[in-house]
Amino acid sequence: SRQLAQESARLETEASQTMATVTSADGRVTITARPTGAIESVRLQSGAAADLASLGVTITETIARAQRVAAEKVLVSMEQTLGADSPLVAAVRQDVDTAFPQVGGSTIEYR
């Protein structure tokens, strides 16, 4: 029980410090996000504003990818600690899939 409490505290600390940085395929946008969905930074390369309409789409898609990657980092840590078959890991994975859907569809929606 004490070991579980220590592991739980470690996971919580690790999750609060986890970030992911993702760059768009065209290199115009770099986003750093936390697994909670919080955005730490948005960086644009010079000349990125040449086509503002497509830049908006690129920013939105890159944010979604960064949020998902950050959340998946926490899931990997949870799987290593609790096991891949853990009901808690399964529940968190379902929440991640709902909150941060894979980019690639025509729209990106968040709950």
Identify what each model region corresponds to.
Residues A38-L52:
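A short interface-forming secondary-structure element
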Residues Q3, D26-A33, Q45-A48:
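Membrane-targeting and insertion segments and their boundary/processing signals
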